Amino acid sequence: MAREKAQILDKDGIRRSLTRIAHEIIERNKGTGNLVLVGIRRRGVPLAERLAGRIKDIEGRTVPVGILDITLYRDDLTTLAHQPVVRSTEVPFSVSGKIVVLVDDVIYTGRTVRAALDAIMDLGRPKLIQLAVLIDRGHRELPIRADYVGKNVPTSSREEVSVRLQEIDGEERVVILETAE
């Protein structure tokens, strides 16, 4: 059983982090003309939708948002479950020639992002793929890094980062959980 060790971000901290990331995305890409956001199921989806809302507030332009299910692209599929739950990928636009910003809640080993890259490449040939995460907790196993980070949170192997979003969890905060070995 995991116990809560510390709260990293509250509702306002999450909001401020996403607002800053939205500004960084706009600035780095010189606007939103060729931009699409793709949220990685599960918590990357509401974060991508929120970023799109912030970008619209700032730029006055709507940025398309897609939903990516990476279940069948994971390299740990056999350890997940006998019958993994596969949900649909909903990317109702072409990614070819676009600047695709993948959005997820936490980056840890990099394996989820690797699977997402494979899934995106099966949809087309983007001009550029960038990564936005709310939390970077370190401990990468693959040479992958986020372009946009809400907060860097160094953790130990006994700790987990839990992002709780209103849309999914009914509360809004990020906490570190400590697990018993």
Swiss-Prot record:
Regulates transcriptional attenuation of the pyrimidine nucleotide (pyr) operon by binding in a uridine-dependent manner to specific sites on pyr mRNA. This disrupts an antiterminator hairpin in the RNA and favors formation of a downstream transcription terminator, leading to a reduced expression of downstream genes. Also displays a weak uracil phosphoribosyltransferase activity which is not physiologically significant. Pfam families: Pribosyltran. Keywords: Glycosyltransferase, RNA-binding, Transcription, Transcription regulation, Transcription termination, Transferase. This is Bifunctional protein PyrR. NCBIfam families: PRK05205.1-1, PRK05205.1-3, PRK05205.1-4, PRK05205.1-5. It comes from the Bacteria. HAMAP family: PyrR. One of its GO terms (molecular function) is RNA binding. Its EC number is 2.4.2.9. Homodimer and homohexamer; in equilibrium. Belongs to the purine/pyrimidine phosphoribosyltransferase family. PyrR subfamily. InterPro entries: PRibTrfase_dom, PRTase-like, PyrR, PyrR_bifunctional. The keyword RNA-binding applies. The keyword Transcription regulation applies. A motif (PRPP-binding) lies at residues 100-112. One of its GO terms (biological process) is DNA-templated transcription termination. It catalyses: UMP + diphosphate = 5-phospho-alpha-D-ribose 1-diphosphate + uracil.
